[in-house]
Amino acid sequence: MAQTAMIIGASRGIGLGLVRELAARGWRVIASERSHSAGLHDVARERPGQVEIVTADVTDRVQIDALRAAGTPKSLDVLLVNAGIWDAQPVDEASDADLLRIMRVNAAGPIGTARILLPLVRDGGILAFTTSRMGSIADSSGGSELYRMSKAAQNMLARGVFVQTAKPRGIPVLSLHPGWVRTEMGGDNAPVGVAESAHGLADVLSKAHPLDHHFLDYTGAELPW
């Protein structure tokens, strides 16, 4: 039987690349978009019956609740929450609105979404988040403070989801650094292509992992918290 993954945030970039990669490996993929994504709909047309498109925004509780209500409990092998925005401002130069926005999109939104949708993941499945090694406290070179802060917060909150909810059901939690990828957010100078990152992430998601909260990059290497 084909494995099933739900990818929240699949309109473009890494999320879209992962939809393509998993579908090519025979997975069934439920992929979310906030607004119409031509690229995602192209993949769905190429993979009829294999790629299903849903609407979801991690900052919209009504949409996420509706997605859970429409889903089948314990039907997913993998739930990956892929959401993020970039803001390199120092914290002392950011407005209150900037602070709230990046924390909502990069930390609170993905974690809240995961908590709502976790009942759709089978016992022993995988819950994953796209994070960044820039959220590492042990390996920080400084700068880009808003972004680093938000990803460190996401990592901490993901630990709470693991301890409180996922661990009792045998679900490991993966906080995944996809690499510095050539996307709209990563820019043209990034050294890693979308296909390379997606291939590595798919390998990581396809493997069994010890029951813990893991901080890994797209090659499967452990990263320091």
Identify the role of each PLM range.
Residues 46-62:
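Rossmann-fold cofactor-recognition segment
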Residues 7-8, 81-82, 126-132, 172-177:
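Structural signature of the Rossmann-like NAD(P)-dependent dehydrogenase/reductase core
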Residues 171, 175-178, 183, 187-225:
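C-terminal helical subdomain
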Residues 25-40:
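Conserved glycine-rich Rossmann-like NAD(P)H-binding loop of the short-chain dehydrogenase/reductase
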Residues 85, 90-100, 111, 123-167:
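Catalytic loop of short-chain dehydrogenase/reductase
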Residues 59-74:
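Conserved Rossmann-fold cofactor-binding substructure of NAD(P)-dependent oxidoreductases
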Residues 11, 15-20:
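N-terminal Rossmann NAD(P)H-binding glycine-rich loop of SDR-like oxidoreductase domains
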